[in-house]
Amino acid sequence: MAFELPNLPYGFDALEPHIDQQTMEIHHGKHHNTYVTKLNAAVEGTDLESKSIEEIVANLDSVPENIQTAVRNNGGGHLNHSLFWELLTPNSEEKGTVVDKIKEQWGSLDAFKEEFADKAAARFGSGWAWLVVNNGNLEIVTTPNQDNPITEGKTPILGLDVWEHAYYLKYQNKRPDYISAFWNVVNWEKVDELYNAAK
């Protein structure tokens, strides 16, 4: 069965003024859609068509070598963006077990946000910043391009796209401003759900 572009759980303008409508329309309808189209082309006629995107990306080493790069880039792009849309909400509220765990590990939510922001800003070129569960503990990691932490056995529960296509229309070269705005639209309820499933 072909992979499909998921619908957004909110309107394209729902995250204004933090993430603008035009960026959301292009990011979802063009960028993410292209990953889905290219992923489907890469896996057509292989047994990967019957697997979940999580299973494929977690086991990239088992993907045939001739399509491995295409699947890594486009499968990762599809998985990362599908999760990213769910991690955003116009009704952000900082609460849940995961917020308590963050405070326990970092001392405060602000200290966590600062480290996350620093690592996201320092990610050279295109990539992602993540909060992951690794052996029961929380870790902040970054990945290049469309790589996902599940390839390394870590479970992502919060992710931020720091490719320029995610912010350039509104923030231009000011990635730190985009990262700062991100905290206003984090879906902590979803982060908490993922944390409780992974711990």
UniProtKB/Swiss-Prot annotation:
The cofactor note from the UniProt entry for this protein is: Binds 1 Mn(2+) or Fe(3+) ion per subunit.
Which EC class, in a word? oxidoreductase
Q: Which cofactor does it need?
A: Mn(2+); Fe(3+)
What happens when you mutate A111T? In strain: 1K07
Source superkingdom: Bacteria
User: What keywords are annotated for this sequence in UniProt?
Assistant: Iron, Manganese, Metal-binding, Oxidoreductase, Stress response
Q: What is the effect of changing F12C?
A: In strain: 5SI5K
Q: What is the effect of changing D61G?
A: In strain: S087
Q: Where does Mn(2+) bind?
A: H27, H81, D161, H165
Cellular component GO terms, alphabetically?
Answer: cytoplasm
Enzyme Commission identifier(s) = 1.15.1.1
- InterPro entries in the record: Mn/Fe_SOD, Mn/Fe_SOD_BS, Mn/Fe_SOD_C, Mn/Fe_SOD_N, Mn/Fe_SOD_N_sf, SOD_C_sf
**Pfam families reported for this sequence:** Sod_Fe_C, Sod_Fe_N
Q: Explain what the record says happens when changing D147V.
A: In strain: A4065G
Q: Does the keyword DNA repair apply?
A: no
The Swiss-Prot or TrEMBL record annotates one GO molecular function as: superoxide dismutase activity
What disulfide bonds does the UniProt entry report for this chain? Answer: none
Keyword Oxidoreductase assigned to the entry: answer is yes
Q: What is the effect of changing V43I?
A: In strain: S087
Q: How does it assemble?
A: Homodimer.
- Spell out the note in the miscellaneous section: The levels of SOD activity and sodA expression were growth-phase dependent, occurring most during stationary phase. Expression is not affected by manganese. Is not essential for aerobic growth in complex medium.
Q: What does this protein do?
A: Destroys superoxide anion radicals which are normally produced within the cells and which are toxic to biological systems. Catalyzes the dismutation of superoxide anion radicals into O2 and H2O2 by successive reduction and oxidation of the transition metal ion at the active site. Also contributes to the inhibition of lipid oxidation. Manganese-preferring enzyme, less active with iron than with manganese.
Q: Which family does it belong to?
A: Belongs to the iron/manganese superoxide dismutase family.
Q: What is this protein called?
A: Superoxide dismutase [Mn/Fe]
